[in-house]
Amino acid sequence: MQAIYRSWDEAVFSDYLTRLAVPADKKFKDFSRGMKMKLAIAVALSHSPRLLVLDEATGGLDPIVRDEILDIFNDFTRDESHSVLISSHIVSDLEKICDYIAFLHRGRLMFVEEKDLLYENYALVNMTKTQLSGMPKGSVLGSRENSYGAEVLMLRSDIPAGMVPERTTIEDIMLYMAREER
């Protein structure tokens, strides 16, 4: 790899191989998808990068290995000059390591927001179908009707007095916004 990367650090690479339990005596063609991903991450981190661009970096990995890799990314970003741009369908991974989250749905950017502000600004509200039909246009960001009424995603600032907001998750926000787009 020294021929490819000017700042290649063999010692760092060796440390990552050990930390990620990548076998040195196995041929690459015999690696599982997870082992190939761990090797790719070790390579990516072993040449003094400032930015990692990762597509489904933890996909196909068991939860223990995923958590270990997320810890490595957290360690990497402790240096203020380092960043990670990660694309993932595993929302819990994003919740663990991201400061900002962008949500793309069918080629449309639905939001880019600081993670903590997503929790602070959005809420789910249970209401009747009649209450839902009377909500001002634009205040309902997404809804799911059921036999009891409706569960509605709203900005906390748009929730009418007397209605009780419930904490939402980032996955809920994404699902409700995507549902409203249909």
Which residues does each predicted region cover?
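ABC-family P-loop ATPase nucleotide-binding domains
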Residues: 1-39
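Catalytic Walker B motif of ABC-type/P-loop ATPase nucleotide-binding domains
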Residues: 52-56
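Short loop immediately C-terminal to the Walker-B catalytic DE motif
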Residues: 58-59, 91
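Helix N-cap at the start of a conserved alpha-helix in ABC-type nucleotide-binding domains
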Residues: 63-65
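ABC ATPase "signature
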Residues: 112-113
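C-terminal coupling/interaction segments
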Residues: 140-182
